Amino acid sequence: MERYQQLFDRLAARKEGAFVPFVTLGDPSPEQSLQIIDALVEGGADALELGIPFSDPLADGPTIQSATLRAFASGTTPDQCFEMLAAVRQKYPDLPIGLLMYANLVFSRGVDEFYARCAAVGVDSVLVADVPVEESAPFRQAAMRHNVAPIFICPPNADDDLLRQIASYGRGYTYLLSRAGVTGAENRAALPLNHLINKLTEYHAAPPLQGFGISEPAQVKAAIEAGAAGAISGSAIVKIIENNLNDRAAMLESLKTFVRQLKAASLPA
């Protein structure tokens, strides 16, 4: 989890924000998934947020559900996902790698075993999307035992108690929700969340990255101007994959261009 701290220190010294793309591992196939990750890094991604496909994704909108179905159709299994993660870590030793997933996948092998496996392949953080802070003890304790950062979602309506808990338990970064609901680029990010960001800073929370509905450079710029340490974009990236399934070269080029544009918005003016 030290990779996040090193990244944020490096970016702060340059007065930059972080741009973090999300993709589902195995979409559209394990082999193409690794090429897609290369394109994201070449485009300038500061860190990666990766999903392990799951049959019942509660927080995902239609775009990411389609990605999950494509990954399943290509035969992607959790074991293969861990092989991909090990390959990505080997290729990019300093890049923070986060997982975004659901509790059933953590439970399937035992919570401690899951985090041990994450640590073994070089995963820096895990966000379990369907586990609220008040039920997170077994997850965050296992994560900390294995030096994996437990990531918590800060919703737009978080009260003071929740903000204090997130600040106390979270490591790596804080996933700041632009709005309630499911993911999707078609649901644009709401206005910057200055109040929450100020409170998280006051309580010494891990740096906030704003996610949900980030699909254009202006939104990245607005998030950083509001005090976020950066932005996460998922559905807009997965949409590019979906729209170019029949043309691999165009897909990789479009992904690179998109990341380059959103990363550029994180640079000082």
Curated annotation (Swiss-Prot):
Keywords: Amino-acid biosynthesis, Aromatic amino acid biosynthesis, Lyase, Tryptophan biosynthesis. SUPFAM superfamilies: Ribulose-phoshate binding barrel. GO terms for cellular component: cytosol. GO terms for molecular function: tryptophan synthase activity. The active site is at E49, D60. Its EC number is 4.2.1.20. The keyword Secreted does not apply. Pathway: Amino-acid biosynthesis; L-tryptophan biosynthesis; L-tryptophan from chorismate: step 5/5. InterPro entries: Aldolase_TIM, RibuloseP-bd_barrel, Trp_synthase_alpha_AS, Trp_synthase_suA. It catalyses: (1S,2R)-1-C-(indol-3-yl)glycerol 3-phosphate + L-serine = D-glyceraldehyde 3-phosphate + L-tryptophan + H2O. The keyword Amino-acid biosynthesis applies. Pfam families: Trp_syntA (PF00290). It comes from the Bacteria. Tetramer of two alpha and two beta chains. Belongs to the TrpA family. The alpha subunit is responsible for the aldol cleavage of indoleglycerol phosphate to indole and glyceraldehyde 3-phosphate. PANTHER family: TRYPTOPHAN SYNTHASE ALPHA CHAIN, CHLOROPLASTIC, TRYPTOPHAN SYNTHASE, ALPHA CHAIN. This is Tryptophan synthase alpha chain. The lineage of its organism: Bacteria, Pseudomonadati, Pseudomonadota, Gammaproteobacteria, Enterobacterales.
